Amino acid sequence: MSRVGKSPVSIPAGVDVSIKDDQISVKGAGGVLSLAQNALVKVSNNEGKLSFEPVNDSREANAMSGTVRQLVNNMVVGVSKGFEKKLTLIGVGFKAAASGNKLNLAIGFSHPVNFEMPTGITVATPTPTEIVIKGADRQVVGQLAAEIRAVRPPEPYKGKGIRYADEKVTIKETKKK
């Protein structure tokens, strides 16, 4: 059995988990998240802990028990604490400005690049070269950060572009004559 799937998910105070036939929904201060129930995994709630059991001994069911456990854990952490990704803009004249649920980027193109934030996601720019994306859904936060980074990824010679705050970009040496 999956080692991840064996460990239960503890439910903190202020988080409500409901398990229906086809859906698991988690409700908390950060909002409501839901996940489609997998037929290969049986989810049960015992005294504030969620346990995940594969319905049979197949390899696929064992793998799915770990996957479903981690997805539900991400939902519980998301509605209680939330997730955030930080991006940094490096380059002369590179700027970001957040207004409401829109993000405007001036990153060296002849036109500004605009992003519309999905529901449940907030974006902030503490400085013009920093972007902070926050939300309850880990997948959406990471996907949005990756899409913003993909507009102008860091180039290998000077390191200019958009990178994650904790990302290390290796700088190549220029060609010598």
From Swiss-Prot:
InterPro entries: Ribosomal_uL6-like, Ribosomal_uL6-like_a/b-dom_sf, Ribosomal_uL6_a/b-dom, Ribosomal_uL6_bac-type, Ribosomal_uL6_CS. The keyword RNA-binding applies. One of its GO terms (cellular component) is cytosolic large ribosomal subunit. Pfam families: Ribosomal_L6. It comes from the Bacteria. GO terms for biological process: cytoplasmic translation. PANTHER family: 60S/50S RIBOSOMAL PROTEIN L6/L9, LARGE RIBOSOMAL SUBUNIT PROTEIN UL6M. Belongs to the universal ribosomal protein uL6 family. Part of the 50S ribosomal subunit. This protein binds to the 23S rRNA, and is important in its secondary structure. It is located near the subunit interface in the base of the L7/L12 stalk, and near the tRNA binding site of the peptidyltransferase center. This is Large ribosomal subunit protein uL6. The gene is rplF.
